């Protein structure tokens, strides 16, 4: 009896059979009813077969690939915990950067998982559906590994105990939350422009490189490891972001003005969101990697400039107000740290005045702005603290209606003047931090008048109290004086000094970084 050896499928054919060949054309239901949001935004798709799949993975390959990474990752997590790896970090102040990451970035990734799970259902093209499904699983995995990486710190440091609860409530966490809420309430193509292109492709290096490099410079091997584990995923996500934009632009010329408007909007929203990351780089890392100004120059001005030059042939120009970011990179991190320093009664992490070494580093990195505009402010606050009059602002800051950051930024052409824009819509006045946010509101006022602004809600009595202290403890679940306020002399600082066998200083040191080990 003759036997026939069946030829094995190559990877390309296997991928096609297990993804696109599982799709079908609708018959007993109208295609418009099955995919109702595909035409919602005015994007015209003429041929889904032109979609170039960026992931090129089948599910069985995906699970095998990720399982191998998980094994190595959790082995390192276990070793880190068993060897008390938290004792090897540069200084306890570094953990405050992790608190910011866990409360602001990890829930953002979970929202991305929810968003990709939803929009993947909205595309009639099988390639796009599979890509969104893969990225949804990636984002969920990132949340899990980040939480597991930082869970060890929760045993030894304050402020990491209730990140999911805080994300929906704390005033400065409404910045990342409002970004993703905005994206998830848009149509499917705008969501991919917001997350896959504007954030994952254009700006993601400004998020992950500072955090992972900062972790390496400060002895945090757990965070470095999950960063490396996510790196290959992020490469696929960036590829998807570029493919999305090029695919839409190549499908129909009518898509160009719609996409340009989205790029203008989401670039500005991403830039404002990353202000928190820039502040972390410049102020929260005891051992610093690079300044925000340097990072913006490398990862956006150089890399982003080349990208938009490439997109010129499709009729796409650089984002609106991009020139303001070149000016703002010299100012925004100092302004935000100054705001969080004075409003730290309502944060879940500690703040402090940089020591002289750090102030000198900032002077070196920002030679045209720091000594002139910001160093005198920090030195004055340090003098006040030395006299026992550490400055706290007993109010809460006024928030921008769109990005929800405090309105504390200055005019692009005048660093001594606050930037404030306002307009009246249907008899109600709304305020904004910049021209960029004001323009976004003008294009979609019906959306942004519904924004849930934490400070407004607190003062209206909708947050379990009308005063800051009650809201912080009851509504935010933050332990006042333990999770927040000044780092110097805090319980966390005292424990770190005891661990290192040091004696606590009586005042903020003027000649070196605080409590550096």
From Swiss-Prot:
It is an enzyme of class 1 (oxidoreductase). Its cofactor is Fe(2+). Fe cation 2 binds at residues 139, 200, 234, 237. GO terms for biological process: phenol-containing compound catabolic process. Pathway: Aromatic compound metabolism; phenol degradation. It comes from Pseudomonas sp. (strain CF600). SUPFAM superfamilies: Ferritin-like. GO terms for molecular function: metal ion binding; phenol 2-monooxygenase activity. The multicomponent enzyme phenol hydroxylase is formed by DmpL (P1 component), DmpM (P2 component), DmpN (P3 component), DmpO (P4 component) and DmpP (P5 component). The oxygenase component is a dimer composed of three subunits, DmpL, DmpN and DmpO (DmpLNO). DmpN interacts with the auxiliary protein DmpK (P0 component). Keywords: Aromatic hydrocarbons catabolism, Iron, Metal-binding, Monooxygenase, NAD, Oxidoreductase, Plasmid. This is Phenol 2-monooxygenase, oxygenase component DmpN. Binds 2 Fe(2+) ions per subunit. InterPro entries: Ferritin-like_SF, Phenol_Hydrox, RNR-like, YHS_dom. Coiled coil: none annotated. Fe cation 1 binds at residues 109, 139, 142, 234.
């Amino acid at each position: 009896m003759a036997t026939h050896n069946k030829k094995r499928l190559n990877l390309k054919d296997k991928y096609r059979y297990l993804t696109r060949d599982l799709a079908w054309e609708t018959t007993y239901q109208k295609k418009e009813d099955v995919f109702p949001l595909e035409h919602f935004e005015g994007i015209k798709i003429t041929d889904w077969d032109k979609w170039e799949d960026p992931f090129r993975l089948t599910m069985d390959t995906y699970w095998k690939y990720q399982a191998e990474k998980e094994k190595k990752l959790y082995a390192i997590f276990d070793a880190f915990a068993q060897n008390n790896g938290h004792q090897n970090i540069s200084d306890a102040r570094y953990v405050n950067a992790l608190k910011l990451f866990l409360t602001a970035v990890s829930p953002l990734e979970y929202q991305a998982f929810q968003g990709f799970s939803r929009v993947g259902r909205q595309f009639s093209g099988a390639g796009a559906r599979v890509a969104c499904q893969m990225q949804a699983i990636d984002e969920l995995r990132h949340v899990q590994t980040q939480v597991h990486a930082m869970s060890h710190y929760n045993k030894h440091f304050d402020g990491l105990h209730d990140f999911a609860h805080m994300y929906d409530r704390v005033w400065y966490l409404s910045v990342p939350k409002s970004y993703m809420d905005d994206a998830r309430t848009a149509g499917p193509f705008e969501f991919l422009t917001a997350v896959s292109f504007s954030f994952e492709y254009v700006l993601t290096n400004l998020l992950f490189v500072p955090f992972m490099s900062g972790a390496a410079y400060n002895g945090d091997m757990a965070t470095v490891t999950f960063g490396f584990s996510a790196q290959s995923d992020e490469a696929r996500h960036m590829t998807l972001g570029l493919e999305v934009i090029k695919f839409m632009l190549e499908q129909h010329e009518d898509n160009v003005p719609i996409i340009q408007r989205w790029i203008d909007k989401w670039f500005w929203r991403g830039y404002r969101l990353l202000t928190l990351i820039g502040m972390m780089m410049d102020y929260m890392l005891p051992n610093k990697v690079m300044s925000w100004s340097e990072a913006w120059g490398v990862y956006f001005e150089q890399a982003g400039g080349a990208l938009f030059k490439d997109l010129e042939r499709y009729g796409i120009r650089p984002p609106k107000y991009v020139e303001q970011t070149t000016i703002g990179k010299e100012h925004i991190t100092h302004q935000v740290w100054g705001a969080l320093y004075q409003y730290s009664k309502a944060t879940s992490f500690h703040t402090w005045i940089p020591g002289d070494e750090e102030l000198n580093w900032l002077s070196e990195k920002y030679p045209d702005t720091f000594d002139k505009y910001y160093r005198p402010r920090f030195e004055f606050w340090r003098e006040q603290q030395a006299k026992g009059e550490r400055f706290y602002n007993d109010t809460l800051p006024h928030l921008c209606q769109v990005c929800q950051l405090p309105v504390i930024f200055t005019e692009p052409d005048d660093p001594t003047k606050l930037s404030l824009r306002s307009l009246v819509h249907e008899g109600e006045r709304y305020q904004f931090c910049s021209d960029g946010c004001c323009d976004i509101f003008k294009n979609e006022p019906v959306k942004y008048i519904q924004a849930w602004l934490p400070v407004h809600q607190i003062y209206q009595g909708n947050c379990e109290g009308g005063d800051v202290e009650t809201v912080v403890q009851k509504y935010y679940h933050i332990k006042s004086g333990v999770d927040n306020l000044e780092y110097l002399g805090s319980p966390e600082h005292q424990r770190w000094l005891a661990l290192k066998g040091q004696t606590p200083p009586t005042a903020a040191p003027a000649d070196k970084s605080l409590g550096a080990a």
